[in-house]
A protein has these predicted regions:
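Sec-dependent N-terminal signal peptides
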Residues: 3-13
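Scaffold/interface architecture of coatomer-like assemblies
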Residues: 16-379
Length: 379
């Protein structure tokens, strides 16, 4: 048996019964409180190397394992505290991550381990991380390790979002708005239209998994930050539900919060009987492209983003050619395992577009660079 507890910056998780909820609130208001330490527990830490994520941050984390036999006793409240101190550069400021967790009574018959994990993002540099677990009955454990955060040899030319020595939460609000971009020096006169397929897997799955949405949002953010683009249009849709969930005409930014609302409209566990009709999904894509591109003479670049796991029947070539061939450059960021077997993949190929499979920040940066370069040349 293994229980997993996750620690993130700014998060408070309460497990078990709510009997200690008032105590937890009181403890959260006492950051200076020191728990008495009388019995040291056996615990060990496993860490993972910092990796460059699609937000262009070095992301690192850890797992701490404690045998359940060490936790035998009545229900209690634990305080987990992670202190990350920059070693170099020395001028950087340390950060403290704290979380209170309530656990129910642990009987003597229970076996296995409890795993407590957490993560954070840093800029390049060296850090000392110290993790403490204490509880009000005096049990405690502490582990420490060093973190050496740097870009790999192949990523040396990839710019980072965090300064050396900077420490930030691993998790960010997925649909936060972007800061304005100064587009004056680069012209900012290219128009970008994005088709975003919000399906991330089987329609039988009851929930939408945010970590599968995150790479698609990262593509949109990287495109938005390019100063060559000045206006943006978005069509967010579900191929499985066969409907448009959100649409915005050309404007000076993407409305990420509205896109988040569109994601919450998804109902992947619900299947309409009309969705089961033969070729219904390919017909939906054909109609979507026809309606959206017929009268759009503003787009300089058309970008499709999404997962397409369904290997549907190919739209007949004669029907693809009947669609108005976009005057814009066409690109597809496809996160599926077999991208060219998807309906959209076949259409993009017929249109002579470029397709990308993104697995790293470097690949994302290179793909967006190609989108900009090809669009400027074609224009």
């Amino acid at each position: 048996m293994r229980l997993v507890i996750v620690l993130c910056l700014g998060a408070t998780a309460v497990l078990g019964q709510a009997g200690n909820a008032t105590l937890i609130r009181e403890l959260e208001q006492r950051p200076d409180l020191t728990f008495i330490r009388t019995k040291q527990l056996s615990c060990k830490v496993k860490k993972f190397k910092p990796r460059l994520d699609l937000e262009f941050r070095l992301h690192t984390g850890y797992w701490v394992e404690i045998p359940f036999k060490e936790l035998i006793g009545p229900e209690t409240v634990w305080r987990m505290q992670l202190v990350v101190e920059p070693i170099s550069p020395e001028s950087a400021q340390p950060e403290t991550i704290e979380q209170f967790v309530e656990t129910g009574a642990v009987p003597e018959t229970v076996k296995g381990t409890v795993e407590m994990s957490g993560s954070f993002a840093v800029g390049e540099g060296s850090y000392r991380a110290t993790w403490h677990l204490t509880e009000r009955f005096g049990r405690y454990c502490s582990v420490a390790w060093d973190v050496d955060a740097k870009r790999g040899r192949r990523d040396r030319d990839v710019p980072l979002a965090l300064e050396p020595g900077e420490i930030r939460p691993a998790r960010q609000y997925l649909f936060r708005q972007e800061e304005p971009v100064d587009r004056s020096l680069a012209g900012g006169d290219l128009n970008l239209k994005v088709f975003l397929n919000l399906d991330t897997g089987s329609r039988r799955r009851a929930t939408v998994r945010p970590w599968l949405i995150a790479p698609m949002v990262a593509v949109m953010r990287t495109l938005f930050r390019r100063p060559e683009f000045g206006e943006f249009a978005l069509v967010a849709y579900s191929q499985e539900d066969q409907k448009i969930l959100y649409r915005s005409d050309y404007g000076d930014d993407f409305d990420f919060q509205a896109m988040g609302s569109a994601v919450r409209k998804l109902a992947p566990a619900t299947v309409d009987f009309r969705d089961l009709a033969r070729d219904s999904e390919s017909n939906f894509i054909e109609e979507l492209l026809s309606d959206e591109l017929r009268n759009d003479d503003r787009a300089d670049a058309i970008v499709f983003i999404g997962y397409e796991h369904w290997e549907g029947k190919k739209i007949p070539k004669e029907r693809v050619t009947q669609l108005d061939l976009p005057r814009a450059s066409v690109f597809y960021f496809n996160f599926a395992w077999h991208p060219w077997n998807s309906t959209l993949g076949k259409v993009v190929r017929e249109w002579g577009g470029s397709q990308f499979r993104i697995r790293s920040a470097r690949e994302l940066l290179q793909a967006v660079e190609k989108v900009v370069d090809d669009t400027m040349v074609a224009r």
